[in-house]
């Protein structure tokens, strides 16, 4: 990596909705900066599920090293916590080797767990939440943010004064448990923001993105997606498994079982993928540190942003 010696390990995050073009750009970045890709996709962790997860092809994986792909069988339980425990050491090791990690994928919770950690939430006190909501209505979010800064300055520093939901939630944690939210995170073994991350999210206008999604589903079918699903069922992976209930796989399973027509399965697959893309965008928009880049400008703009980050930091 270029630049001086950062106080924290550096990571490039490349995220965005499904079908936006993350894989191509991630590989280009890794090649240009001598980096390696760490996948952040909740479905690409599974073996034998290649076409329906839009997993990088063997040829693409041969161009640069990939991590966190094909690390579990479809009948294994896999969570954001397990992902973070596996991916964090990889990010650390790559930094120690002087290799730039490119954390690329569309599963926002996995990215968050890896970069910032997760902590076990206590059961929220509904009465406290309702009272804090009323106070936010009467006094404004900024006033509650000032209160949070007194009892939990670490969390307050990470939350924008206008982010009412997170302010109220953090205050509720403190009032209900006597321990700040930052204390809960530390108590459960997660360091506070151990990485210096440049977060880049690719976006496209809705019409173009949805067109790409529909086309990609057609390509998956042409590449043998139905055969892939039939092969998983033949291996003994039950339709009820969490992995088999994901988008695409549940639709093809329903068709193969005779429950719906092929036409309906394909249309539902496209529709649910579009809905998922919309939810992904909503998730990423909630991150104030995200740098948004039009996908059409990605190959030119993103390398510039990375060079600036490596030289000067954020």
Curated annotation (Swiss-Prot):
Entry EC number(s): 2.5.1.75
SUPFAM superfamilies found in the cross-reference section: P-loop containing nucleoside triphosphate hydrolases
One MF term in the entry's GO annotations: tRNA dimethylallyltransferase activity
Catalytic activity line of the entry: adenosine(37) in tRNA + dimethylallyl diphosphate = N(6)-dimethylallyladenosine(37) in tRNA + diphosphate
Annotated binding of ATP, by residue: 16-23
GO terms under biological process: tRNA modification
Annotated residues for binding of substrate: 18-23
Keywords: ATP-binding, Magnesium, Nucleotide-binding, Transferase, tRNA processing
Keyword Transmembrane helix among UniProt keywords: no
Site (Interaction with substrate tRNA): 107
InterPro entries (UniProt xref): Dimethylallyltransferase, IPT, P-loop_NTPase
Region Interaction with substrate tRNA: start-end pairs: 41-44
Cofactor(s) needed: Mg(2+)
Name of the top EC class for this enzyme: transferase
Family: Belongs to the IPP transferase family.
Subunit structure: Monomer.
Role description: Catalyzes the transfer of a dimethylallyl group onto the adenine at position 37 in tRNAs that read codons beginning with uridine, leading to the formation of N6-(dimethylallyl)adenosine (i(6)A).
Name under which the protein is recorded: tRNA dimethylallyltransferase
Organism name: Desulfosudis oleivorans (strain DSM 6200 / JCM 39069 / Hxd3)
Source lineage: Bacteria, Pseudomonadati, Thermodesulfobacteriota, Desulfobacteria, Desulfobacterales
């Amino acid at each position: 990596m270029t630049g001086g010696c950062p106080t924290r390990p550096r990571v490039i995050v490349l995220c965005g909705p499904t079908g936006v073009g993350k894989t191509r750009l991630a590989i280009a970045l890794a090649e240009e900066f001598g980096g390696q890709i760490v996948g952040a996709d909740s479905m690409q962790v599974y073996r034998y599920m290649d076409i329906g997860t839009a997993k990088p092809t063997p040829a693409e994986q041969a161009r640069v090293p990939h991590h966190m792909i094909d690390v579990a069988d479809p009948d294994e339980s896999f969570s954001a916590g397990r992902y973070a425990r596996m991916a964090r050491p990889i990010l650390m090791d790559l930094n120690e080797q002087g290799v730039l990690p490119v954390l690329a994928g569309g599963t926002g919770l996995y990215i968050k767990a890896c970069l910032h950690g997760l902590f076990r939430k206590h059961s929220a006190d509904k009465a406290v939440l309702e009272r804090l909501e009323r106070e936010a209505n009467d006094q404004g979010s900024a006033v509650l943010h000032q209160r949070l800064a007194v009892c939990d300055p670490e969390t307050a520093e990470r939350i924008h004064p206008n982010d009412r939901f997170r302010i109220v939630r953090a205050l509720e944690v403190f009032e209900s448990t006597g321990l700040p939210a930052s204390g809960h995170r530390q108590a459960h073994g997660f360091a506070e923001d151990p990485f210096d991350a440049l977060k880049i999210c690719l976006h496209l206008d809705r019409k173009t993105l949805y067109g790409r999604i529909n086309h990609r589903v057609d390509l998956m079918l042409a590449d043998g997606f139905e055969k892939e699903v039939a092969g998983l069922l033949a291996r003994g992976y039950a339709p009820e498994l969490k992995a088999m209930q994901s988008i695409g796989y549940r639709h093809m399973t329903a068709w193969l079982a005779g429950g719906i027509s092929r036409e309906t399965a394909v249309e539902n697959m496209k529709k649910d993928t579009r809905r998922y893309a919309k939810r992904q965008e909503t998730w990423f928009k909630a991150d104030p540190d995200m740098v948004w880049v039009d996908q059409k400008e990605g190959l030119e703009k993103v390398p510039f942003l990375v060079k600036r980050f490596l030289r000067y930091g954020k």
